[in-house]
């Protein structure tokens, strides 16, 4: 049976501060209209290795725990790791920023770095079959653990290595996974975050060249992996990219740009405790 909600209820959901996960980076939260929205479908973080995808995932897993009494969702997180890049030490460093924000608003003895980390359920998987098995368990896990966000880091790693010579099967599986995640997002009011890699594409004809600004014929261009069919399965894409710091006399790529589906761009810098405004 198809269930619907009124347009007014949808508006209230999207504008409520407790229905957004703040990044605590002013420029990024402004671009995101207050933060990452909860319950709207799949949101993809896309970029090359080292562009800050996993860092931003950890920040969201921590910041979703900001209490409702100070405008946060007050929920917990599930973090599904397919690449083994999850670092407990880095998570502890980042948790200090979340805790400082909470204590500045309303100091509470119940909220500590240890509790913030404890409220993130970590699941390590190695292939698509394991992910599908986990997906069948997620509804009960969400109900019993006050879950508000599910993070899969990364989705592309699992799909790309699945039956490499059987593209129809891969397409079928990614559609099945995306539909399951989208339904869960709306039924249980969850934020679904997945990370995706960039892949090299080559264009040899004028028509394709014109579709991508500043791409010369025959030269490589970076695009989100998983193809065009995947694009229709997500509700938002944020592309992360390392940039040179124009404010500093350095060639280091220590600034991150984030571009949304509308072409809007926000910048932040990575620091010891997470991210900060550029």
Indicate where each model-derived feature is located.
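Amphipathic alpha-helical transducer elements in NTP-driven molecular machines
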Residues: 22-25, 29, 39, 54, ...
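Conserved catalytic network of the ASCE P-loop NTPase/AAA+ motor domain
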Residues: 35-38, 68-73, 112-115, 140-145, ...
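Conserved inter-motif catalytic segment of the P-loop NTP-binding fold
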Residues: 72-167
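Conserved P-loop NTPase nucleotide-binding/switch module
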Residues: 150-179, 204-212
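Phosphate-binding/switch region of NTP-binding enzymes
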Residues: 172, 179, 183-278
């Amino acid at each position: 049976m198809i269930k619907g909600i009124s347009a007014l209820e949808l508006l209230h959901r999207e504008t409520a501060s407790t229905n957004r996960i703040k990044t605590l980076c002013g420029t990024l939260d402004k671009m995101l209209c207050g933060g990452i929205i909860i319950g709207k479908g799949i949101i993809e973080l896309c970029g090359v290795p080292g562009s800050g995808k996993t860092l931003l995932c950890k920040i969201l897993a921590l910041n979703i725990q900001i209490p409702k009494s100070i405008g946060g969702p007050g929920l917990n997180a599930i973090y599904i790791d397919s690449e083994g890049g999850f670092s407990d030490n880095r998570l502890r460093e980042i948790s200090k920023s979340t805790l400082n924000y909470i204590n500045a608003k309303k100091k509470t003895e119940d909220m500590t770095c240890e509790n913030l980390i404890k409220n993130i359920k970590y699941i390590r998987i190695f292939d698509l079959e394991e992910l599908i098995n986990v997906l069948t368990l997620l509804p009960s896990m969400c109900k019993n653990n006050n879950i508000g966000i599910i993070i899969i880091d990364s989705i592309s790693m699992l799909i790309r290595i699945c039956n490499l010579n059987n593209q129809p099967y891969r397409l079928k599986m990614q559609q099945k996974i995306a539909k399951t995640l989208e339904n869960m997002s709306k039924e249980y009011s969850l934020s679904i975050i997945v990370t995706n890699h960039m892949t090299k594409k080559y264009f040899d004809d004028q028509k394709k060249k014109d579709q991508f600004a500043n791409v010369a014929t025959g030269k490589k261009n970076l695009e989100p992996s998983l193809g065009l069919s995947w694009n229709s399965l997500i509700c938002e894409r944020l592309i992360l990219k390392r940039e040179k710091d124009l404010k500093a006399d350095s060639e280091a790529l220590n600034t991150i740009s984030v571009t949304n589906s509308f072409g809007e761009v926000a910048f932040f810098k990575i620091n010891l405790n997470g991210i900060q405004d550029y």
